[in-house]
């Protein structure tokens, strides 16, 4: 597999064409962002940690029979992905009250929800990724109602697998963000990444093991992510 010209550069990744039109070469970068990109910082080692964590998680999801874009890890900072057209939605699932959800409803963080809540956010930096509902998704021609139901059900299925993965290493999956994409034949599959950048994880003492250590200036991001990676590797 040969890496070719740059296709896209985002906040945390660079995507390259390959000599296979259906495969992308993905490089994870060291940039950390918060406040929807308003705060940016280069943190040496972050890209390698996220790539390795994401690779381990996606390997487990693939083994469970879920269809994802992940093919294989190439190096500490690189992986191969199936080429998809990203659906402009952030699909967020919440198991525990935290973050913006707590602020929106005036609740204390840490309340366990009776059942998981799935939310949609429209991926648009200029609009600050607004919270939207099913009808908005249809109005914007992002997805059909049947596709919306698939996104919800697939996210709930993924949640059950992820909760077990994280629980095995002593972490609670508080909430997380997923992105999905369409293959050339129109099928929708899981894409993007699953890491402490996109998940809120708490240990048994309530310590944050995710990007909140950067967002809230409460810890060292590299040390935290390294601990998460070590826990996952030791659980293999």
From Swiss-Prot:
GO biological process terms held by the UniProt record: 'de novo' IMP biosynthetic process; cobalamin biosynthetic process
Database matches in Pfam families: SAICAR_synt
Top-rank EC class of the record's enzyme: ligase
Single GO MF descriptor: phosphoribosylaminoimidazolesuccinocarboxamide synthase activity
Pathway: Purine metabolism; IMP biosynthesis via de novo pathway; 5-amino-1-(5-phospho-D-ribosyl)imidazole-4-carboxamide from 5-amino-1-(5-phospho-D-ribosyl)imidazole-4-carboxylate: step 1/2
Reactions catalysed, as given in the entry: 5-amino-1-(5-phospho-D-ribosyl)imidazole-4-carboxylate + L-aspartate + ATP = (2S)-2-[5-amino-1-(5-phospho-beta-D-ribosyl)imidazole-4-carboxamido]succinate + ADP + phosphate + 2 H(+)
Transmembrane segments: none
Its EC number(s): 6.3.2.6
Stored InterPro entries: SAICAR_synt/ADE2_N, SAICAR_synt_PurC, SAICAR_synth, SAICAR_synthetase, SAICAR_synthetase_CS
Annotated keywords: ATP-binding, Ligase, Nucleotide-binding, Purine biosynthesis
PROSITE patterns: SAICAR_SYNTHETASE_1, SAICAR_SYNTHETASE_2
Family the UniProt entry places it in: Belongs to the SAICAR synthetase family.
PANTHER family found in the cross-reference section: MULTIFUNCTIONAL PROTEIN ADE2 (PTHR43599), SI:DKEY-6E2.2 (PTHR43599:SF3)
NCBIfam families associated with the record: purC (TIGR00081)
Protein name: Phosphoribosylaminoimidazole-succinocarboxamide synthase
Source species of the chain: Lactococcus lactis subsp. lactis (strain IL1403) (Streptococcus lactis)
